[in-house]
Amino acid sequence: QVQTAKSGVIVRDNCYGSLEDDVVRRDFNINALYYDIHKHEVIDYVGGLKDLEAKEIHIIGEAKLRFSEDPVRMIRAIRFSEKLGAELSDEVKSCILDQASLLSNISPARLYEECIKLFHNEYSFGVYEQLEKYGLLKHLFKQTQKNEFIKKALLNTAARIKQNKPVTPVFLFAVFLWQAQNERFVMIKKKQRSFYLAMTQASEEVIINQIKQVSLPKWLTARIKDI
């Protein structure tokens, strides 16, 4: 049965049915295509193939309702847009701008996994710019301000992925929190004579603030502090 929180977010949905039933539960037309392994053909109920060819992203149903059901759909829209080089529909754009704050209703643990999907790819900088443009970034990284360092780091990550080189979320989160950590360190150092203690305290405070939005595994926070 479908269960929702007071905010309208769907917290449980284990209703199963036909393809026709399933398709209306999908988020975007381009993400609602089915393949018949016997007939070797694509089944398209909502015009997903047409949208793929036109490089457009339309939501299934009413955007305002669908985003309130699952706010993560907003950042999925951004990711699909950058990955496919597709344009968001006017309805999707408008509703993301209006409902960006709903992302705060999502559990920090789930947002950690979503952040990896957002930034560990060849189009991560484009994703970053779009998240900022639509007011979503601050609901993932409220301590992070746009700067050239992040741009260089994301472009470097993209280049490594293209070259089939390994990437790590340690580097990703350290970069996003670097400026906030440095600013906090400067403030603490005015009162704390020990460089090491000031650096450690600044790192811990910034990470504590971050995990309120996006959970970070303990092994990850330890390595972020090392960086």
Which residues are covered by each model-predicted region?
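Catalytic cores of the polymerase beta-like nucleotidyltransferase superfamily
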Residues: 1-227
